[in-house]
Amino acid sequence: GNATGPLRWNHILNERLFSNTSLVLSNYDYEFGLGMGEDGIAVQSVIRDVNVKQDFSYYLNNDNTLKLGFNVIHHTLEPGNLDAGNNTGLSNREADQKYGFENAVYVQNQQQLTPKLNANYGLRVSHFSQVGSGTKYTFDNDGNLLTSEDFEAGERIADYLQWEPRLSLNYAVNEMSAL
C-alpha cells in the first residue's frame, strides 16, 4: 500500500524570521496484474523517498517577504518486478533497485508593487544525482548496445543541474478575482 509519514516543526525565530522544517517519509507501491493464479502475471513498482526540507520566511518590510530554503530527497526505486504464474511461460524477474538524490536551493521575493499588483520573483537551483550500485548502458540510435559501465554502491552514475528562474505577477481585479 501507499503511506506517508510527515514530521514538521515551525518556529518563530524573531519578529521578522519564521522557520519551517519538514521530514517526510513516503512509500508508493504500484501493482498491475492480469489473470489469476497460475495463469496470471503481476508487475509491481515501488518508490520510497526520504525528504528533508528547510524553509525560511523573512519579512523585510510591509511590501517584501523574502523566502529561501533547501530540499534534499533520497529516492529508492524498484522499477518493476514481474511475478508470473507457472502457466504463463514467463519467468519471474526482479529489477535492480535504483537510487538517487534530488537537491535544491531557492530564494524568492514576494513584493507588493501597488495595492492591486504583486510580484513573485526568484531563482531555484536543482540537482539530481543517480547513484550506484548499478550498470549504465549506452545505446546507438538503432538500439544496439555500445558500452556498459558498472558502478559501486554510492558511486555517482549521472548528474543533472538545472537553473530555474521564477517570475509571476498577480493583479487583483476586485476582492473576488485576480489575473
Sequence positions of predicted segments:
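Signature of Gram-negative outer-membrane beta-barrel scaffolds
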Residues: T65-N174
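Transmembrane beta-strand segments that form the barrel wall of outer-membrane beta-barrel proteins
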Residues: S26, V125-H127, L179
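Alpha-helical hydrophobic/aromatic positions enriched in membrane-embedded helices and signal peptides
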Residues: P6, K53, L60, L90-N92, ...
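Beta-sheet entry/capping signal
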Residues: T21, A178-L179
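Outer-membrane beta-barrel domain signature, strongest for Gram-negative TonB-dependent receptors
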Residues: G1-L77
